[in-house]
C-alpha cells in the first residue's frame, strides 16, 4: 500500500481538511493530545455527530484495563531506584533522587528510540570517560526501571509498544487511517504506522509544514522514512494557504532574515508598549472595543502571550480592572501549590534538624492553623529566642510574652512529627503525611482559602487552590504503592516526592462560559477565534531551551557515531518551538 502526505501551512487549514473527510466511510484519526479538541470540532462541524469518524490519541486508543503508570508515578519509581543504587552510581551518586524527573525523561527518550541498556553498555566502550560513566549510571537505573515494569506495569512509553496489537483489535482494519498534526514520530510510533499500512484501507498523514524558513518539516521526513522502511511509497500534496493577505505575508516571512515587502494591512495593527502592563492595557481596550462596538463575544477573542506564567499577575490586575472574563490555558505544577509547599516544608524540618528558616516558613503557612496574630507572635519569638538549628524544639523561655499561646503553638508544631524519624520506608512517610493533613485540617483550610479567592473574583486561582489536597493524596497513594517498602532518608524521599509533584500538572476547567482565551503563543492551538491579539513578543519568543539534559547534544552526536540514534536534540526542540509560534 502507498501512503499520502498532505502538507498544510496552518492549524486552520488542518482543521478545514478534516472537515472535508468523506462521510459514510470509516475514518480513524490519530493526533497529538493538544490537537484533539480542534480535530473533534472540525469533524463535528462538517458531519454533525460523526459516528463513522473517530478522533483519538495513541494513549486513548489503547484504552484502559491495564496497570499504567502516570508520569509522576514513573518519576517516583525512578527516584526510588536511583536512591537504592546510590553506592553504585558514578556521576549521580551524591544526590541520586535529585534529578528523578530528568532521569525519567532520559529513559523515556531512550525507550522511544528503542535503545536498550545493552546498547548503552556497548556504546560505553567507544565513549570518553565522562560519557562512559554517565551511560553506566543511566544503564543501571534503566535496568532497574525495566525490572520494575516487568512486574506487570506499563508506563507512557510502554503503552506505545502495544499500538500494533491494539490496531489489529481496535478498528484500524478497513478504515481510512489519518496521522494528524504530529511534530515528529518516534521509532515506537513507527510501529503504529507499519501496522496501519498492513491493516487499513488507506493511510494518510496531515502534517503542518511548507517550504518557508518557519517550518522544520521533521514529521514529514519521519513519516516518509518509516513508510519506506515498511515498504510503502509516499506522495506529497501541498495544501495552499487560505489566510488573508496580511496573515499570509507574516507566515511567509516570519523568522526570514530578508526584510519583507511592505503590505497594505487593514486587518493587522501594531502597538509597541512601554512595558508588559502597557501592552496588556492596550489589549484590554481592543477587547472591550471588539465586544462593545463590533458585537463580538469574549469567547471570539484569543490573547496569545510570550510568557503566560510570567504575565499572570499583570494579567489578573489589568483584566480585573477592565472587567474582562478570561480563561488562561496554562498548566500549573502541583509543586507550586501552597499545600504542597507545606508538606515539603515538613520534610525539610525533619531532614534538616529544625533549621530556623524552615521552622519560620512552616509556622507561617496558613495550613499550620490558628489565627494569624498568634502565628506571628510565635514566629517573632522563634526569631528572637530560638534562631538556631533545633531551637524550635526547645521549651518556651521564661519571660516571653503570652507563654501559654507560645507553648500551645510549640506543642502543635512538635505534634506534627510524632512517630517520625530521619530514615523510614516510603509507606511510613506517606502515612505520616496523611496524618499531618488530617490533624491540621488542611482540607478545611484549603476550602476557606479557595472561597476567599473566589470572593475576590480570582476564579482561576480559587480553582487551582481547590485541587491541592486531592492531587497530593493521589501522589501519596502512588508513592505508597510504588515505593512503599523502600527505606530512604527523609531528604531522599522529599526529593523524589518534590519531583513527582513537579511532574503532576494541574489543568483548570474554564470558569466562564463566555471568556477570552489566553494561551502561550508557542504552545496553544486555537483556530476558531475571530480576533487574535499577540503580546509580549520580545526577542525571548520563542523561548529557547538550554542544553541541560542528562545526555547533552554533544553526547548525542558522539552516540550517533557509535550507532546509537537518539533524538531530539535541544536545537531540534527549539526549531519546533519556532514552528509552533508561526
Regions found by a protein language model. Give the residues of each.
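Short gly/pro/ser/thr-enriched loop/turn and capping motifs at secondary-structure boundaries
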Residues: 62, 212-214, 333-336
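Anion-coordinating catalytic cores for phosphoryl-, nucleotidyl-, and glycosidic chemistry
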Residues: 2-55, 66-67, 193-194, 242-582
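Conserved RecA-like helicase ATPase core segment
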Residues: 189-273
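Basic/charged alpha-beta structural segments of nucleotide/phosphate-handling enzymes
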Residues: 34-40, 44-172, 187, 221-223, ...
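Glycine-centered loop/turn motif at secondary-structure junctions
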Residues: 152-153, 200, 231, 294-295, ...
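ASCE RecA-like P-loop NTPase motor cores
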Residues: 1-27, 68, 72-83, 143-206, ...
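Conserved coupling segment at the C-terminus of the helicase ATP-binding
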Residues: 129-130, 134, 141, 209-213, ...
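Short loop/turn segments at strand-loop or loop-helix junctions that form parts
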Residues: 58-61, 205-210, 535-537
